[in-house]
């Protein structure tokens, strides 16, 4: 059941391939680590899918009317015991990608755009904050609050108040920080209405690489 290697021609993958698993695309193209157990591989592949689903869905949301006019997720449910792109398996059990899609599809979305592709210790990196209101009602005097943290240390934080018009999307702020260690950086961003109720929340984690060799 557990193949000896990640090689696509390893006969151990034959049964997996029957169920649509693609070892070459998974391990060589997407560069997803297999892990030491099936459970670790499931966690690694689901994490990759969740990150990709969130990145794509949020990107399309930010491109509203420029040129995106509608958004449909493919694919949602597996129709048989398939190792594929569905975010819900054939037993109707949600994968990590389902919850990523749920967050990216919030009607009022505090979107986090990754500007810097690779974060490195000691180098500046940037994310861009957006506020998207895909409802037919204005969010009057909404409060936007954000925070960037690394290993318990706050690298940046801030807040602002503004009205989000109905059917709108706005670029709010670019945030540039310098990670000081190899620990992951977490960006937290939320939108509250004037009564203090959270109407949208989001979080993004950035892995930090070593400084480039001199």
Residues covered by each model-derived region:
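Generic hydrophobic, helix-prone segments enriched in Leu/Val/Ile
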Residues: 25, 101, 110, 171-172, ...
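Short beta-strand elements
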Residues: 197-214
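Short edge beta-strand segments in beta-sheet-rich domains
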Residues: 96, 157, 199-203
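Solvent-exposed residues in well-ordered beta-strands and their adjoining turns
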Residues: 132, 149, 176-178, 192
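Intrinsically disordered, low-complexity Pro/Gly/Ser/Thr-rich segments with frequent PxxP/GP/PP motifs
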Residues: 142-143, 153-182
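Short, aromatic- and glycine-rich surface loops/edge beta-strands on solvent-exposed regions
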Residues: 183-194
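Substrate-binding clefts and catalytic carboxylate motifs of secreted carbohydrate-active enzymes
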Residues: 1-141, 148, 156, 164
């Amino acid at each position: 059941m557990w193949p000896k290697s990640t090689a696509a021609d390893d006969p151990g993958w034959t049964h997996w391939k029957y169920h649509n698993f693609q070892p070459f695309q998974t391990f060589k193209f997407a560069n997803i680590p297999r892990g030491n157990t099936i459970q670790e591989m499931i966690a690694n592949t689901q994490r990759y899918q969740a990150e990709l689903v969130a990145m794509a869905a949020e990107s399309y949301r930010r491109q509203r009317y420029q040129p995106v006019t509608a958004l449909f997720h493919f694919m949602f449910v597996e129709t048989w015991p398939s190792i594929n792109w569905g975010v819900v398996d054939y037993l109707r059990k949600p994968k990590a990608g389902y919850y990523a899609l749920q967050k990216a599809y919030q009607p009022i979305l505090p979107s986090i755009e990754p500007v810097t592709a690779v974060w490195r210790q000691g180098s500046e990196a940037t994310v861009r904050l957006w506020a998207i209101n895909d409802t037919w009602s204005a969010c009057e005097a909404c409060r936007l609050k954000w925070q960037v943290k690394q290993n318990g240390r706050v690298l940046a934080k801030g807040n602002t108040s503004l009205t989000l018009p109905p059917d709108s999307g706005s670029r709010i702020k670019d945030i540039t920080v310098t990670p000081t260690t190899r620990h992951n950086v977490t960006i937290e961003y939320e939108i509250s209405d004037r009564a203090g109720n959270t109407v949208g929340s989001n979080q993004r984690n950035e892995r930090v690489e070593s400084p480039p060799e001199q």
